Design a protein with these regions (language model features):
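Alpha-helical DNA-contacting segments of helix-turn-helix folds
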Residues: 241, 245-261, 265-266, 294, ...
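Alpha-helical bundle regulatory/interaction domains
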Residues: 1-33, 70-72, 78-218, 223-225, ...
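Helix-turn-helix DNA-binding module
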Residues: 238
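Conserved short histidine dyad/triad with adjacent acidic residue
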Residues: 32-33, 38, 42, 46-65, ...
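A short acidic, glycine/proline-enriched capping/turn motif at secondary-structure boundaries
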Residues: 54-58, 75-80
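Short polybasic/polar patches that bind polyanions
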Residues: 42, 229, 244, 285, ...
């Protein structure tokens, strides 16, 4: 299945991912309309999704509690540095990440990818993967999977995994057992300083993402001081983290996410009725915008139309 969509906002992509059981919220971190392509394939034990976009996108809520969703990127250009982050793990051409989806709580993972790469998710049934790891005594792999966010692979297995997925995401999955074998081979690669990464800021980053999407705090126009208190960090540290990982400040990030969520609810008439959000003003207040005029201006800047035109 291949989907190509030119969009004004990334809600359509969320809907496509929902068909794979991923209730993922997506925020575009730069202005203007976008274009993305998505290819997907699945069998009983394995699902694949390859996404390419011309805008930087933030994904929140990935993971269904049943599968472990291994992620990697394929560069479109020879660029130095990170192409994005998966649960805070830096994504380069040798990265394999997404280990945080081992958590049984759905929607616990996040990722951010720029427009210079495509990202691929390989979703393997968790119970079967654990059985295979234990049966072949892959104890190093088990330790990495349960203790790390990702690894850098320098063996042939990751390249083979990428080639297999690139072929079968469009042609259909023919060798589901091969994905388990190759992932285990990646996890069992001997540990070196080159393929390990200190998980600095992992917990803080997850708190930032959770706070930005929290329905409990969505109605409150949080100040920078309140955000720092919630995350238990200094303004200087929070600024450095957000600039490094998101390319913007925390308030700007939260504002963009709230705009996306307000648009999501504005386009869903059933949800509006259930929440008793009968007017644009009701929706603006629900998502922390107390001044309707400012909300309308920010909405127009983000989506190219006024709330009344949606």
């Amino acid at each position: 299945m291949k989907t190509s969509i030119e969009y004004r906002d990334p809600l359509e992509l969320s809907e496509e991912l929902a068909k794979l059981g991923q209730l993922t919220k997506i925020t575009q971190l730069e202005g203007g309309s976008g274009f993305y392509t998505m290819q997907a394939a699945n069998t009983n034990k394995v699902a694949l999704a390859e996404i390419s976009a011309n805008k930087t996108l933030l994904y929140e809520g990935w993971g269904n509690g049943i599968t472990i969703d291994f992620n990697w990127i394929t560069p479109k250009a020879n660029t130095q540095g990170a192409f994005g982050y998966c649960d805070g793990f830096k994504m380069t051409k040798n990265s394999l990440a997404g280990f945080g989806t081992i958590n049984s709580v759905p929607g616990n993972a996040w990722g951010k990818y720029n427009n210079e790469c495509s990202s691929t998710g390989c979703m393997l049934e968790k119970q079967l993967l654990f059985e295979l790891l234990e049966n072949c005594k892959a104890y190093d792999g088990l330790e990495r999977l349960t203790g790390d966010q990702g690894i850098y692979c320098n063996n042939k297995a990751l390249n083979q995994l990428k080639r297999l997925a690139a072929r079968e995401v469009s042609a259909g999955i023919q060798n589901p057992e091969k994905y388990f074998d190759l992932v285990i081979a990646c996890l069992e690669e001997p540990m070196t300083e080159q393929n390990s990464q200190d998980p600095k800021h992992i917990d803080q980053l997850r708190e930032i993402i959770n706070l930005a999407h929290s329905e409990k705090t969505m109605e409150s126009p949080l100040s920078l001081l309140e955000v720092c208190k919630y995350i238990n960090t200094s303004q200087a540290s929070l600024y450095r983290i957000c600039q490094e990982y998101f390319g913007m400040g925390i308030i700007e990030l939260m504002t963009q996410i709230r705009l996306e969520e307000s648009r999501r609810i504005m386009l869903n008439q059933d949800a509006r009725r259930k929440l008793k959000l009968y007017s644009i003003r009701d929706i603006a207040i629900k998502y922390g915008f107390k001044h309707q005029g400012r909300y309308a201006r920010r909405y127009y800047t983000a989506f190219g139309e006024l709330p009344s035109q949606t």
